[in-house]
């Protein structure tokens, strides 16, 4: 032990021993935290530790415990000790009493000390003691020494004082606190060693203090709570007492305020220590005086209180409060707020005592008294110890040098030292460092009896003044265990092992008996977990088994509780009764007053209700008046709207008249036009003149037969002008007559209607000259077909919507003409129509044509012209621009066109395209904008290019022109310009922002480019650049996508700086008037400069004029008002709209025939179809009506109809293989024995091995040498096991103990012990026996002897030739023996080749042995390469590979059966029909397109075409877009490819397959629009042959039922609606039972009832039922179809909702703000206001008299009076 450690050990004043040294302390210390419990608890509560941590009572502790409060029995002794301490402090020269025990002489020494100018000396005894000699032995330790480093480096030993009074209470508290800190440091040291050194067995505190390792020396400087820097290791910081105490007081918050820090610093000054001592002395004197003369002190305090001034009292109170706060802060180490500035300690102790007495008397009950009382019982630590001040080198005025100190804290921990001196080590420097400048700590010590919950918690009875001997306990503890890997011998380990086995056996036995119920049974496979083991067990508690007295006490308590509850119930019931009686009498007292209040309240309620009724009546009358005024305003507004409509009609008529005049070149036509106009006006004045004119018309009609077409056209060119003037006259008459209809007009309309019904409409007769035919059939001329329309397939979806009646039919929709066979059949030309016609569409088209024809005949003059044309037998069908359709088809070289084709245009325009150019040129010449709405594929692009070429050639206007198109067709427009008008400089505006900025650079220069082509999206992105530039023509392609006037796109494009505007659309205009108004208003602002139409009508007026009549027409009811209104709308649209259909303008287009081919199901298809329908799951699915499940069922049935391999693949047949045959176990026993025992030479086989082990010969060990056997026995010593067995037999007697007894624990343990020993002995004997058997084996001769005796003869004799023939005589007689296996195989080979085709159901592997007998193993050896031992191979036949397997051919034929490839066709009825159809088509020179929905069907078709050897091409959804054009061009140019198989999901952009003239639909798509697009790929402009469409339908299946129902109800076109999304209309109209051909079931739910999906969700549902490839292809096709959706996505819809589109200047806005977005129909006539019938019941019968009086007086009814009163303005 080091000297430093010895010195530290002697610094303890009392040498007390911790409770851990007491007996049982080791166990108790394991239950508590060895580090934190005692110090933290002591600091937190200010009390001493509990019993288990309490030091043993020695002399010093007895003296400390006697210092009690004044109120306790030991108070007088405490007062004496306080007086002695006071005396010692007041007289520093007096030396303390010397101890009487044997101690060395101490020399007193005076040490001067200066505190605030005061000088005093303190005597310190220098004790010198000789160091005892070190003795060897485990029980003796070195005597501790203490070395105090000073200037002279003297060795000083502090004397242990025997008398407890010799130390002052302040010093005693200081020593106790230092001990606590030292103990904590020792425990931290021990805990550090336990955590760092896991295998720690013994712990020496003195040696631990010498630990200078790098782990422990990782020191970090930390600012301590008391303002100094404390040196603590990282490990010590976790267990710092000050930190733990502060965290407990402050809840973990350690940060102090500045004021608290300043107060602490002021409290820790040197002079404050002296002040504390003086105050302590004053307090003690005050306490002594209070006990003796309490009354006198109170009188003195009152006198002093009266004399002192108020300010002096407040200052002293603040000072006293600051002192108390600083004391608490020093004791708790927690920051507290100081209430005043710190005062200097200049006042005397007497004034301090007076101030404290004053504060005590003034603050009784408010907290100051508590502080005064605490000062009596608390003691403070003296920071400056006179005994250590002189000897230590610590200077309080200088910071403590931590680097010079070597820290050696000591911890007791669990393992206790051998002596008391080694346990406690105290250093003055350590105390001064931890508590510099006199830190004040308050220790409130109160002992509580320990809680005893275990017998081990009881303390040992040790005589007073004696110390228990802990060395024996420590040695016993250290010897109570041994380390298994270090301190135990083999014998001890075996004994330990035996004890553990016995313990486990006892535990298992107790578990079986149920004693240990908490533990799991190992036999059941359960065991304790690590967490359960670590959890441990609870300490035993007191037994809960009740005794008789417990029952008596419990009964008494229960009875007492019952009595108390009964008493409480009685009291509560009495209270309730008293309250009820009191409430009753109170109610009787105020009954009259309450009645009065209720009556007054009732009157108020009645008055309020009556006032509300009257006010409600006035409000109702006010609403009636407002409604009347509103109706009057609407009537006035309607009149203004009619007036405005008239102006618009007049402007439209003028524009149309100007157009017609421009078409007529000769002056003769103009003169005839004037004459006819005058004649029409005269005919309108008199009926007689009208009849004369009709006669003249008849004469003219007879002369028309002799006129040519040109003369007829010139003759009737002014019909439109006549019609316009007649319409103007009718409008003037309507305005003059008001709302009454003109009778003459009704009669005229009736006559026109009758004449129209009696006439026979005829189809226009195309009069085509041979030259014209050559023009359209010439291959050299560039025909402008529909190839330039890349979005034709996209526009085809909108054609299905044109069949609905309404505005679409009136603006150039399909006009199917009625055929009347009763009239003149000579003038009717029959068109070739489709084989499957849609009757409902024909009826709708006929109705539309009839309405259109009625609307166009709006004047009598037009009716006369129709009569004249009818007389000639040809009806001229007017189009939307007033030009007859007959003119469109009769443009021949004989008639010079009004507008010559521009020379910049390369190519020849068709007739209708030439007329389109003329119409567009007329729009430009008349300063009007328009809409070109030709059907898709008619060449709107080339007509637009020709218009721009016309402007460049005729008007010398090259641009700049802006063409805005969808993104997908930008490249197509550029290619068309380069193809047909290469003279234009075209700039395609696209790319990223940087590229677009480069293209805009210099574009304002003239002739940089002429035409700019861009997309809708880029226009919005670069709106600032496009809006600044002035454009001559702005052309919008796909203009139907800007029909929403609230969108940002519409509003942005509306304000572009343009001269003219043109809209292109292939979609017919819908019945939505708002969309129509949006397009028309988009065109109108351009006409504002010429004031032809000063702005278009606002949306409200437009809806009032046309919405109600259109709604009636859609609903089916057509009246005169509707017809008149629609005629006006048609007249407005005529100058701005041109729409033509294919069948009207293109008569050269080939016909289209559709055939339905019914295919029978094959036998396999019918089986699978019926089997699927008969399943219970299928029927249950159809009953539930779940849409997704039904779609899945339908998809499976369609797979069966297309090909059965799609539903269930034809399997590859193989045999079931078994190892043994069924008869193998039942073979005869004799045959089995013979096969094992008999060794045949020629036909049998010898055993492969000979075993002699059963005879005792270890022949298998002959490969081992004798030396190896000896070495093996040498290194496997069995003697050790034998010795171990003998030792165990000696230890455990062989005789068996008494029978196992469970009632005797000792006997049971003996039996268990003996059984365990016998078990171990038995196991060792078995090991010995096995070792002996293993070591007994040895070779008979050995390998070394055999090698010595072996002679190699291979080199002496040559090799013998192989024998190829058997030497047996019987083998040479071939006529007597059976044929060999090879001979049999050769003989049966032809039969096997021809007839071996049926694969057996099962085969076995041992049939060869059973069927071939003894030769079977030989065959297996030779042909299956099973090698036998060399000893048995006497005859060598040859290498096994050279012999052919005789069973190979039969195995190949019978082992596996692949389905024949020809079954692919014969398993499917559609493929059988397709084979014959393709044979006929190819023989006729036709080429076919085969479409299917499923991708797997394409795979089947590929196999089918490969079987037949036909060349084909394939296009499916996986084909890239760039490859599609290559495939289509190759197919169109290569006639050697007859078949093209495609998927309906392969997309529609850029596919033109006019090279084929036959379309075969192998199956129909879910979406019929897909099939329609497929037809359009072949049947389109450019096709020269008739197109035949074959649709394959499996009869008596779901496909035939769907087609049948579709033909009956016409629901096929209703599957698809707007935007290409699916709806449930198709499934709502057709039930599942109709599709499957089942009987109707009332329980089955319709599909629509269980389906509530939107279009997208429904599309996903259909995709789930399809294959993954088909679903992916459909997704790609939809994406391509909707490629331009993002261009027209209304991203700003919400922002622009309700926005009103304005004009380009300050002109009137198109909509009124209050009516923005209103779509309801306006009222055409004022609605009469119904007067509400309201009567007030007054409860009497005088109402009649009052009403009669009012009527007599002229006032009238009260309602009329109120209305009149409000109308006069008196109400507002």
Swiss-Prot record:
**Composition bias, Polar residues:** 7-19
Domain HSA stretches: 536-609
A GO molecular-function term, please?
ATP binding
Q: Which GO terms describe its biological process?
A: chromatin remodeling; recombinational repair
Question: Which EC class is this protein assigned?
Answer: hydrolase
Domain Helicase C-terminal: start-end pairs: 1470-1623
Work out whether the entry's keyword set contains Transferase. Answer: no
Write out the function statement from the record.
Catalytic component of the SWR1 complex which mediates the ATP-dependent exchange of histone H2A for the H2A variant HZT1 leading to transcriptional regulation of selected genes by chromatin remodeling.
Listed name of the protein: Helicase SWR1
Upper classification of the source organism reads: Eukaryota, Fungi, Dikarya, Ascomycota, Saccharomycotina
């Amino acid at each position: 032990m080091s000297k430093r450690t010895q010195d530290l050990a002697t610094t303890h004043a009392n040498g007390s021993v911790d409770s851990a040294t007491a007996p049982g302390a080791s166990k108790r210390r394991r239950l508590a935290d060895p580090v934190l419990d005692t110090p933290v608890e002591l600091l937190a509560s200010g009390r001493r530790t509990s019993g288990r941590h309490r030091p043993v009572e020695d002399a010093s502790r007895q003296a400390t415990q006697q210092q009690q409060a004044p109120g306790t029995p030991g108070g007088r002794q405490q007062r004496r000790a306080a007086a002695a301490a006071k005396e010692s402090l007041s007289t520093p020269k007096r030396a303390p009493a010397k101890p009487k025990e044997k101690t060395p002489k101490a020399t007193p020494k005076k040490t001067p000390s200066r505190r605030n100018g005061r000088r005093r000396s303190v005597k310190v005894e220098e004790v010198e003691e000789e160091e005892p000699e070190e003795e060897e032995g485990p029980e003796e330790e070195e005597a501790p020494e203490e070395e105090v480093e000073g200037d002279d480096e003297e060795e000083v030993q502090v004397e242990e004082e025997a008398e407890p009074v010799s130390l002052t209470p302040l010093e005693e508290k200081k020593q106790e606190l230092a001990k606590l800190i030292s103990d904590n440091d020792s425990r931290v040291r021990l805990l550090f060693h336990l955590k760092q050194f896991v295998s720690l067995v013994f712990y020496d505190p003195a040696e631990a203090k010498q630990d200078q390792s790098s782990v422990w020396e990782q020191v970090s400087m930390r600012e301590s709570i008391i303002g100094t820097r404390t040196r603590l290791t990282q490990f010590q910081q976790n267990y710092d007492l000050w930190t733990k105490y502060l965290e407990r007081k402050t809840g973990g918050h350690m940060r102090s305020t500045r004021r608290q820090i300043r107060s602490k610093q002021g409290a820790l000054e040197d002079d404050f220590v002296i002040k504390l001592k003086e105050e302590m002395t004053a307090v003690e004197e005050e306490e002594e005086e209070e006990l003796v003369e309490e009354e006198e002190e109170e009188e003195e305090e009152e006198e002093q209180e009266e004399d002192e001034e108020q300010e002096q009292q407040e200052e002293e109170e603040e000072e006293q409060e600051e002192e108390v706060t600083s004391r608490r802060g020093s004791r708790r180490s927690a920051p507290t707020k100081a209430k005043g500035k710190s005062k200097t300690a200049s006042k005397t102790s007497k004034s301090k005592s007076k101030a404290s007495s004053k504060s005590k008397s003034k603050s009784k009950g408010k907290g100051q008294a508590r502080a005064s009382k605490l000062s009596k019982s608390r003691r403070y630590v003296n920071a400056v110890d006179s005994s250590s001040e002189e000897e230590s080198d610590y200077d309080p005025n200088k910071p403590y040098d931590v680097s010079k100190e070597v820290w050696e804290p000591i911890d007791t921990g669990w393992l206790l030292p051998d002596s008391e001196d080694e346990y406690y080590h105290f250093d003055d420097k350590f105390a001064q460092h931890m508590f510099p400048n006199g830190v004040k700590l308050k220790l409130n010590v109160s002992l509580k009896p320990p809680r005893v919950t275990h017998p081990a918690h009881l303390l040992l009875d040790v005589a007073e003044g004696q110390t228990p001997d802990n060395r024996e306990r420590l040695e016993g503890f250290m010897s109570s265990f041994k380390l298994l890997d270090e301190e135990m011998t083999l014998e001890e380990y075996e004994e330990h092992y035996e004890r553990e086995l016995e313990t486990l056996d006892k535990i298992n036995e107790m578990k079986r008996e149920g004693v240990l119920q908490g533990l799991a049974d190992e036999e059941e496979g359960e065991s304790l977990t690590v967490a359960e083991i670590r959890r441990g067990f609870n300490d035993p508690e007191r037994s809960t088994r009740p005794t008789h007295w417990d029952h008596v006490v419990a009964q008494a308590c229960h009875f007492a509780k019952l009595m108390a509850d009964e008493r409480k119930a009685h009291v509560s019931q009495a209270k309730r009764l008293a309250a009820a009686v009191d409430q009753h009498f109170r109610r009787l007292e105020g009954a009259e007053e309450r009645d009065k209040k209720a009556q007054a309240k009732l009157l108020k309620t009645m008055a309020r209700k009556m006032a509300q009724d009257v006010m409600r009546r006035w409000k109702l009358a006010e609403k009636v008046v407002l409604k009347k005024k509103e109706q009057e305003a609407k009537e006035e507004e309607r009149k203004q709207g009619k007036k405005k409509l008239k102006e618009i009609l007049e402007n439209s008529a003028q524009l149309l008249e100007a157009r017609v005049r421009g078409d007529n070149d000769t002056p003769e036509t103009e003169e005839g036009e004037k004459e006819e106009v005058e004649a029409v006006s005269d005919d309108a004045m008199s009926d007689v003149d009208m009849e004369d004119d009709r006669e003249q018309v008849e004469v003219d009609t007879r002369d028309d037969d002799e006129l040519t077409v040109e003369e007829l056209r010139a003759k009737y060119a002014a019909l439109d002008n006549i019609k316009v003037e007649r319409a103007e006259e009718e409008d003037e008459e309507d305005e003059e007559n008001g709302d009454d209809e003109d009778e003459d007009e009704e009669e005229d309309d009736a006559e026109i209607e009758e004449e129209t019904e009696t006439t026979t409409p005829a189809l226009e007769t195309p009069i085509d000259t041979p030259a014209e035919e050559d023009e359209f059939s010439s291959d050299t001329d560039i025909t402008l077909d529909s190839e330039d329309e890349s979005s034709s397939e996209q526009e085809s979806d909108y054609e299905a919507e044109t069949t609905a009646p309404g505005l679409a039919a009136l603006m150039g929709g399909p006009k199917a003409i009625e055929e009347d066979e009763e009239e003149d059949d000579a003038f009717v030309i029959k068109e070739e129509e489709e084989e499957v016609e849609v009757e409902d569409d024909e009826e709708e088209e006929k109705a539309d044509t009839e309405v259109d024809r009625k609307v166009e005949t709006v004047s009598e003059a037009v009716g006369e012209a129709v009569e004249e044309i009818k007389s000639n037998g040809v009806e001229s069908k007017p189009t939307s621009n007033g030009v007859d359709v007959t003119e469109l088809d009769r443009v021949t070289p004989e008639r010079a066109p009004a507008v010559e084709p521009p020379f910049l245009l390369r190519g020849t325009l068709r007739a209708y395209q030439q007329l389109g150019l003329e119409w567009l040129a007329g729009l430009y010449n008349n300063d009007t904008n328009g809409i070109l709405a030709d059907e898709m594929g008619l060449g709107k692009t080339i007509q637009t290019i020709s218009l721009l070429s016309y402007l460049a050639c005729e008007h010398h206007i090259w641009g700049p022109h802006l063409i805005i198109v969808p993104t997908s067709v930008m490249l197509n427009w550029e290619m068309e310009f380069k193809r047909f008008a290469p003279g234009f400089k075209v700039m395609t505006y696209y790319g990223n922002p940087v590229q677009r900025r480069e293209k805009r650079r210099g574009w304002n220069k003239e002739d940089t480019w002429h035409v700019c082509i861009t997309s809708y999206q880029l226009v919005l992105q670069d709106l600032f650049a496009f809006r600044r530039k002035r454009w001559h023509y702005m052309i919008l392609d796909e203009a139907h996508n800007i029909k929403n006037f609230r969108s940002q796109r519409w509003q942005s494009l509306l304000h572009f700086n343009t001269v003219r505007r043109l809209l292109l659309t292939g979609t017919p205009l819908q019945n939505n008037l708002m969309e129509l108004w949006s397009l028309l208003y988009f065109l109108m602002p351009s006409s504002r400069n010429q004031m032809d139409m000063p702005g278009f009508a606002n949306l409200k007026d437009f809806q009032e004029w046309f919405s109600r009549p259109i709604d009636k027409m859609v609903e089916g009811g057509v009246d005169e008002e509707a017809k008149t209104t629609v005629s006006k709308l048609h007249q407005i649209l005529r100058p701005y709209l041109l729409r033509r259909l294919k069948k009207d303008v293109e008569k050269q287009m080939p016909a289209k025939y559709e055939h339905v081919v019914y295919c029978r199901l094959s036998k396999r298809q019918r089986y699978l179809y019926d089997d699927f329908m008969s399943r219970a799951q299928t029927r249950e699915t159809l009953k539930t009506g779940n849409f997704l499940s039904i779609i899945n069922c339908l998809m499976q049935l369609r797979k069966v109809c297309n090909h059965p391999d799609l539903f269930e693949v034809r399997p590859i047949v193989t045999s079931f293989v078994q190892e043994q045959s069924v008869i193998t176990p039942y073979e005869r026993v004799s045959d089995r024995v013979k096969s094992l025992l008999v060794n045949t030479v020629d036909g049998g086989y010898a055993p492969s091995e000979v075993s002699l082990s059963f005879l005792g010969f270890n022949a298998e060990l002959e490969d081992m040498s004798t030396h190896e056997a000896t070495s093996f026995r040498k290194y496997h010593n069995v003697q050790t096991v034998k010795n171990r067995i003998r030792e165990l037999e000696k230890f455990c007697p062989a005789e068996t103990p008494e029978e196992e007894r469970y009632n005797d624990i000792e006997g049971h343990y003996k039996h268990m012990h003996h059984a365990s020993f016998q078990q171990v002995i038995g196991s060792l004997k078995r090991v010995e026996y096995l070792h002996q058997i293993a070591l007994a084996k040895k070779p008979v001769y050995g390998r070394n002897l055999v090698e010595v005796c072996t002679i190699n003869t291979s080199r002496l004799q040559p090799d013998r030739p192989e024998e190829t023939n058997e030497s047996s005589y019987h083998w040479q007689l071939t006529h007597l023996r059976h044929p060999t296996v090879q001979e049999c195989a050769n003989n049966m080979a032809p039969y096997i080749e021809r007839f071996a085709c049926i694969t057996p159901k099962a085969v076995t592997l041992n049939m060869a042995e059973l069927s071939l007998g003894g030769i079977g193993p030989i065959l297996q050896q030779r042909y299956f390469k099973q090698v036998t031992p060399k000893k048995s191979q006497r005859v060598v036949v040859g290498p096994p590979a050279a012999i052919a397997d005789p069973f190979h051919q039969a195995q190949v034929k019978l082992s596996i059966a692949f389905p024949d490839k020809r079954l692919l066709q014969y398993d499917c009825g559609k493929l059988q029909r397709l084979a014959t159809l393709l044979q006929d088509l190819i023989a006729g020179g036709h080429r076919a397109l085969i479409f299917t929905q499923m991708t797997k069907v394409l795979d089947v078709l590929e196999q089918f075409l490969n079987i037949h050897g036909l060349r084909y091409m394939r296009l499916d959804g996986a084909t890239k877009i760039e490859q599609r054009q290559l495939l289509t061009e190759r197919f169109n140019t290569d006639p050697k490819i007859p078949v093209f198989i495609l998927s309906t999901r392969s997309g529609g952009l850029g596919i033109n397959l006019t090279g084929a003239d036959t379309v075969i639909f192998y199956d129909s798509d879910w979406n019929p629009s897909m099939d329609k697009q497929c037809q359009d790929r072949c049947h389109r402009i450019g096709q020269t042959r008739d197109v035949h469409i074959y649709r394959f339908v499996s009869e008596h299946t779901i496909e035939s039922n769907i087609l049948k129902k579709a033909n009956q109800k016409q629901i096929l076109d209703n599957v698809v609606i707007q935007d290409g999304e699916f709806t449930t209309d198709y499934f709502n109209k057709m039930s599942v039972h109709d599709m499957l051909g089942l009987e109707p079931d009332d329980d089955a739910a319709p599909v629509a009832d269980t389906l509530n999906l939107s279009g997208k969700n429904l599309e996903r549902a259909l995709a789930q039922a399809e294959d993954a490839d088909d679903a992916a292809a459909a997704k790609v096709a939809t994406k391509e179809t909707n490629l331009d959706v993002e261009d027209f996505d209304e991203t700003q819809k919400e922002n622009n909702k309700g926005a009103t589109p304005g004009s380009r200047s300050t002109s009137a806005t198109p909509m009124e703000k209050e009516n923005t977005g209103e779509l309801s129909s306006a009222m055409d006539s004022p609605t009469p206001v119904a007067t509400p019938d309201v009567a007030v019941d007054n409860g009497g019968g005088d109402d009649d008299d009052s009403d009669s009086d009012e009527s007599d007086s002229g006032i009238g009814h009260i309602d009329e009076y109120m209305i009149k009163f409000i109308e006069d303005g008196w109400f507002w």
